[in-house]
């Protein structure tokens, strides 16, 4: 949404083919003249290559991931394929078809795992404690290797808590904020009724 404020910027959103696609988080800008959905899947090398080859992006921002830490224990191979191999596929496609493209990969504080000190910095050792954390560590090192080996503009940002109205309601912090909003609405609704009743039962003069 922020990028679309620039009339010179065209934004492509990569999405997997699905019988029941969910457009809830893109409804505010899906119809923007400078935005377009394209099909692609981080687990499919050919589709990622086609995206880079056909679009020729100046920037490639990868926020896609299987991001449920608990679920990563149930399907570790899939999590590694999406979060680590998916980044590798992006880097390979950029190297082949648009080496001047600037690539950003989203990391996670889960990379640090069992922490030695807080707050962590880039010098803190990475000791992940879940397949999810390990997959993000792998992506981190792949980005570094490709940047140094092929002179690509590739960076990996380690993200900590990040929130927004479009964050899934299955996350703990979203449950908390929704609960706060519900309580506020209930209190506000009660206060409105009290004010209404007070006004209804009061004498008033017209001025």
What label would you give each PLM region?
Residues 1-162, 167, 180-185, 192:
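N-terminal Rossmann-like NAD(P)+-binding domain of SDR-like oxidoreductases, especially those catalyzing
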Residues 176-178:
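Helical cap/lid subdomains and adjacent loops of hydrolase enzymes that gate the active-site channel
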Residues 185-205:
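Short mixed-charge
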